[in-house]
Amino acid sequence: MLRRLLERPCTLALLVGSQLAVMMYLSLGGFRSLSALFGRDPGPTFDYSHPHDVYSNLSHLPAAPGAAGAPPAQALPYCPERSPFLVGPVSVSFSPVPSLAEIVERNPRVESGGRYRPAGCEPRSRTAIIVPHRAREHHLRLLLYHLHPFLQRQQLAYGIYVIHQAGNGTFNRAKLLNVGVREALRDEEWDCLFLHDVDLLPENDHNLYVCDPRGPRHVAVAMNKFGYSLPYPQYFGGVSALTPDQYLKMNGFPNEYWGWGGEDDDIATRVRLAGMKISRPPTSVGHYKMVKHRGDKGNEENPHRFDLLVRTQNSWTQDGMNSLTYRLLARELGPLYTNITADIGTDPRGPRSPSGPRYPPGSSQAFRQEMLQRRPPARPGPLPTANHTAPRGSH
């Protein structure tokens, strides 16, 4: 019976027509539609096997007003939404580590304090890059060497702030970021705050360092450490971007996470509790390379992180920008960045040995162990109202 059915002209015509329709659908981008339906849209395709030099196209940038050959100053149009100087994938090298003098020489347009403003057009975003730091001088120089030309090609107005934790106490990344946000906003009304780990180098300048007015952005979505994929859906670590209003709406970042681990998940929970959603660039765009390093003394695994995480729902309105205390020790305008040195105190709980095997913080073994120990998030209750930051005059 099936054979007789297939021999009918109308049946054959229907089958041939169906095949043609499927072929046309796929040729017109059906694979991308299916990808968006069943998984994360990978975005545009880039060839990372043939990257450009990270300093490509800088010589093509317009000269600043007053410079030799520059047109006279006048009212400027807005810079294009996507800069014509972008090149896509860029080479990232960890050796040799450049000196600060070499980085200054290669970035003559960068002004005191690590500030830059494009010539020839009005920037569409003023972005502050905030980098928590301690005892990572080689990493900092690599970041500055790669990040300055990367940002200049995007035609942004930007400033780089390095927030240095004074003393030898346990490292507190999230609290340093709170300090950096407060100090950066004393300088200027920035449109966008980029919170940037010192050991992550961007590999594609189409990954724009601008904020999304609809909600916080997690930008480091494809790190070589995790095989260029997102390790888990709630991950918010590495590099993230928020407007000042978004940052204050979630009461900033927590101050109580001393040592490695936990604060990224707390921050992702804050975003949800504040009624916002996380957005991300396509996986093909948000590529980062991590500078290899051993576990840092003073940044051991935080044995209290899981206890803190289960309290986030109730603690986020009390622990953050509205409870931030620190002592500003120095504010220095260097040729490549603004250095903020702050005394943020010490862990009031003191050290405690965690149970189970110890692995270097940030290692793949430590990551797997943490995922196995991860507790399910508490069910959200009624959305509380975030308190805003303390008055500007107080620390």
From Swiss-Prot:
Residues 32-395 are lumenal. GO terms for molecular function: beta-N-acetylglucosaminylglycopeptide beta-1,4-galactosyltransferase activity; metal ion binding; N-acetyllactosamine synthase activity. Signal peptide: none annotated. Its cofactor is Mn(2+). Residues 340-395 are annotated as: Disordered. GO terms for biological process: carbohydrate metabolic process; galactosylceramide biosynthetic process; protein glycosylation. Its main location: Golgi. GO terms for cellular component: cytosol; Golgi cisterna membrane. UDP-alpha-D-galactose binds at residues 132-136, 171-173, 198-199, 228, 260, 293-295. Its EC number is 2.4.1.-, 2.4.1.38, 2.4.1.90, 2.4.1.275. The keyword Metal-binding applies. It holds the Pfam family Glyco_transf_7C. Keywords: Disulfide bond, Glycoprotein, Glycosyltransferase, Golgi apparatus, Lipid metabolism, Manganese, Membrane, Metal-binding, Signal-anchor, Transferase, Transmembrane, Transmembrane helix. Residues 352-364 have a biased composition (Low complexity). Gene3D superfamilies: Spore Coat Polysaccharide Biosynthesis Protein SpsA, Chain A. Pathway: Protein modification; protein glycosylation. Mn(2+) binds at residues 199, 293. It catalyses: an N-acetyl-beta-D-glucosaminyl derivative + UDP-alpha-D-galactose = a beta-D-galactosyl-(1->4)-N-acetyl-beta-D-glucosaminyl derivative + UDP + H(+); N-acetyl-D-glucosamine + UDP-alpha-D-galactose = beta-D-galactosyl-(1->4)-N-acetyl-D-glucosamine + UDP + H(+); a beta-D-GlcNAc-(1->3)-beta-D-Gal-(1->4)-beta-D-Glc-(1<->1)-Cer(d18:1(4E)) + UDP-alpha-D-galactose = a neolactoside nLc4Cer(d18:1(4E)) + UDP + H(+); a beta-D-glucosylceramide + UDP-alpha-D-galactose = a beta-D-galactosyl-(1->4)-beta-D-glucosyl-(1<->1)-ceramide + UDP + H(+). The chain crosses the membrane at residues 11-31. Glycans are attached at residues 57, 168, 339, 387. It is found in: Golgi apparatus, Golgi stack membrane. CDD domains: b4GalT (cd00899). Belongs to the glycosyltransferase 7 family. Responsible for the synthesis of complex-type N-linked oligosaccharides in many glycoproteins as well as the carbohydrate moieties of glycolipids. This is Beta-1,4-galactosyltransferase 3. It comes from Mus musculus. The lineage of its organism: Eukaryota, Metazoa, Chordata, Craniata, Vertebrata.
